A protein has these predicted regions:
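A hydrophobic, small-residue-rich beta->alpha segment in the mid-to-C-terminal subdomain
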Residues: 225-226
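Short, low-complexity intrinsically disordered segments enriched in A/P/G/S/L with frequent Arg
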Residues: 8, 22, 43-49
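Short, charge-rich patches within N-terminal targeting peptides
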Residues: 10-15
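Short, composition-biased linear "edge" segments at structural boundaries
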Residues: 24-34
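Short glycine-enriched, charge-decorated loop/helix-capping segments at active-site entrances
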Residues: 174-180, 219-222
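Nucleotide and nucleotide-moiety/phosphate-recognizing core
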Residues: 48-178, 187-203, 209-214, 229-236, ...
Length: 258
C-alpha cells in the first residue's frame, strides 16, 4: 500500500577530503545503514527515530541529502493547518505541528516551497515520504492535494492526512484507512479533490469547546499549557503510528494505536 523503496543518494564530494578519506567515510555510512536494517526488524519506532537523527546528521556532514528514487511513488503525509503567523500555535494547526515534528525526528530531507504547498522529501524509517504543509487555508486543502498528486504521480492510496479532531479528547489519536469528512471542512475539500474516501487519515484530539465558546473560536485559539502537553504526547503517538503503518501496514497500526 505504501512506497517502500529505499531512497537513493546523490553523491557530492565533501570539500577538503581525499579519495581515500571519502572511501573510509562511505564505508562507515554503509555500516550504519546495515545496523539500521537490523534494527528495523526489532526496534520500536522511537528507537528508529533516534537512529534517523544520527543518519540525517551524517548526511549533512557529507554534504548530501536523502533523495527520492525518481521512479518511485512516495507516501505523501499531509498535515492540515492554516498558513501565517496569525494561526501558529492554534488547535486547527495540529497537523502542521505533526509534520514539523516528523521533520525534526528525521532530518536531512530536501525542502521546497511551491505556490500551494511546502514539501520536504524525507527518508522515514527506510521509507521514501513527502511531508507536506498546504499553503492554502484548511477549508481549501484539496487544492494542495491536487498539486501534490500531479507532481508526484500519486493517488489516494499513497496519501496519509493528519488533522485536528474536536470529537476526541486532547491528545487522543485515531487512525483509519477510510471514512467520511466527519464535519471537518479540510477533509471535505480533500475528499472532493481526490474523488474517494479511501485514504488513510490520522486524527489528533483537540477536545470540544467549553462554555459559550463556539467551534470556530475554539479551533482558531491556542490550547492551555496542559492541553498542549496532551496534544504533544498525541503527536508523538501519531508519529509512531505512521512509522508502523509504513513498515507493517495500516491495519497493524490501527490495532496497536487505536
Amino acid at each position: 500500500m505504501f512506497c517502500s523503496a529505499g531512497c537513493s543518494y546523490q553523491k557530492q564530494e565533501p570539500e577538503g577530503y581525499s579519495e581515500s578519506n571519502r572511501r573510509n567515510i562511505f564505508t562507515t555510512r554503509n555500516a550504519i545503514d546495515r545496523i539500521a536494517v537490523i534494527l528495523s526488524g526489532q526496534a520500536r519506532p522511537h528507537t528508529l527515530r533516534r537512529y534517523a537523527v544520527i543518519r540525517g546528521a551524517f548526511a549533512k556532514f557529507l554534504g548530501r541529502d536523502d533523495q527520492r528514487d525518481p521512479g518511485a511513488v512516495p507516501t505523501i503525509i499531509v498535515g492540515l493547518g492554516n498558513p501565517g503567523a496569525k494561526y501558529e500555535g492554534t488547535r486547527h494547526n495540529v497537523g502542521f505541528w505533526c509534520i514539523d515534528r516528523i521533520a525534526e525526528s528525521y532530518p536531512g530531507g530536501s525542502t521546497r516551497s511551491h505556490r500551494l504547498v511546502h514539501t520536504s522529501e524525507q527518508n522515514v524509517a527506510g521509507h521514501c515520504v513527502v511531508l507536506a504543509k498546504p499553503r492554502t487555508y484548511v477549508n481549501e486543502s484539496g487544492r494542495a492535494i491536487t498539486s501534490l498528486s500531479t507532481r508526484f504521480r500519486a493517488t489516494a492510496k499513497n496519501l496519509i492526512v493528519v488533522y485536528d479532531e474536536m470529537a476526541l479528547p486532547s491528545g487522543k489519536v485515531r487512525i483509519r484507512a477510510r471514512g467520511g469528512d466527519g464535519g471537518h471542512n479540510g477533509m471535505k475539500s480533500i475528499i472532493g479533490a481526490v474523488g474517494t474516501q479511501e485514504f488513510v487519515r490520522i486524527r489528533i484530539g483537540i477536545g470540544r469547546p467549553e462554555g459559550q465558546v463556539g467551534d470556530i473560536e475554539h479551533v482558531l485559539s491556542r490550547p492551555s499549557e496542559e492541553e498542549r502537553r496532551a496534544i504533544d504526547e498525541g503527536i508523538d503517538r501519531a508519529i509512531d503510528a505512521i512509522v508502523m503503518a509504513l513498515s507493517e501496514g495500516v491495519e497493524r497500526a490501527m490495532n496497536v494505536y487505536n
